[in-house]
A protein has these predicted regions:
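Short glycine-/aliphatic-rich beta-strand segments at the starts of folded cytosolic domains
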Residues: 54-70
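Short beta-strand elements
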Residues: 21-22, 92-94, 105, 253-258
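Terminal amphipathic helices with adjacent charged low-complexity linkers/tails
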Residues: 95-119
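Short beta-strand
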Residues: 10-11, 90-95
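Short amphipathic alpha-helix segments
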Residues: 69-87
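Proline/glycine-rich low-complexity loops and linkers
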Residues: 1-54
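Short alpha-helical segments enriched in small residues
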Residues: 112-296
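A short linear hydrophobic-aromatic micro-motif
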Residues: 86-92, 229-233
Length: 296
């Protein structure tokens, strides 16, 4: 077998191609077979132990997820922490409608890393309060919403227009959501808004389908029709056409009816049709969560 001089041969217990580790002038090159069923076991059995000997410290991370406020505001709030950070470190990541903060520590073991990270997580929760929806990397915003619904023993329905059922699609990603989500209405036309949700003809004529009043009536009508504790409505202009000076493309109104009380919000999103709809879905989840936190 042709093996570079001084290299370490890694046995392949799941195939024929061996792996190699080569060291030269402080640099390390690691060659592994391509198929995942060969590469992953080889990494775990041979490469990981080799690297641990080279670097006795481990790196451990934890995520703090925030919704309802933008990346620039989050960055401003934690500027002092970032400026004086050494170990642990905080790294912000922007996602549509969310900001994720990854806190990373380096220490001799996982327990020590967790001890170092804990006060940082505590400080972030203190600064951002209810806007923190998760401190685990795997937890999603829709899971946070469903958890709140179950915790409060409340049911949810959705009345969507411009998002076309995309809010419902996000929520049904969560296993066991049938305990909380009753149904969703996709009322894209004015006729459907009247027939399914009881939106008044006068509202559609005088205020228009893209209005706070329409969003309010959609939410109230959806809650009544579905007999749910909560109903979230979305109506807006995703474009590319249909916008006016008074109601430009990207204008979205949402209503949330929680136990008979309905509040509305107005948003102005930018981007193409897909991006506007994506932002609307993310803000809809945040809106539901906010209403649930305030609903008694």
């Amino acid at each position: 077998t042709m093996v570079p001089k001084g290299s370490i041969v890694l046995d392949n217990h799941n195939g024929t191609a061996p792996g190699l580790i080569m060291e030269k002038k402080g640099k390390i090159a690691i060659l592994l077979p391509g198929p995942p069923n060969e590469m992953v076991p080889m990494f775990e059995e041979s490469v990981y132990p080799y690297l641990r000997k080279k670097q006795p410290e481990i790196i451990y991370s934890r995520m703090v997820k925030i919704c309802g406020i933008g990346e620039s505001q989050v960055a401003e709030e934690i500027q002092d922490l970032i400026e004086k950070q050494t170990n642990p470190t905080i790294a912000p990541y922007a996602k549509t409608g969310e900001v994720h903060l990854r806190i990373t520590a380096k220490a001799e073991n996982e327990k020590k890393c967790k001890e170092m990270i804990k006060p940082i997580v505590h400080e972030l929760k203190k600064r951002f309060g209810k806007d923190v929806f998760a401190t685990k990397e795997e937890k999603t915003l829709e899971e946070a919403v469903v958890d709140l619904l179950k915790e409060k023993n409340m049911t949810l329905s959705l009345a969507e227009s411009c998002t076309g059922g995309a809010v419902a699609a996000r929520i049904v990603n969560v296993p066991g959501v049938s305990e909380a989500l009753m149904c969703g209405f996709v009322t894209y036309t004015n006729r459907a808004k009247r027939k399914c949700l009881g939106v008044k003809k006068s509202t559609l004529k005088n205020e228009g389908a893209v209005s706070a009043k329409c969003a309010k009536e959609m939410a109230k009508g959806g809650a009544k029709a579905a007999e749910t504790d909560v109903c979230l409505s979305v109506t807006g202009l995703a474009g590319p056409g249909g916008g006016t000076e008074e109601t430009p493309v990207g204008t979205v109104f949402m209503g949330c009816c929680c136990k008979g009380k309905t509040v509305t919000r107005e948003y102005h999103f930018t981007g193409n049709r897909s991006r506007i709809r994506g932002q609307a879905v993310a803000q809809a989840l945040t809106f539901i969560r906010d209403c649930l936190l305030e609903c008694r």
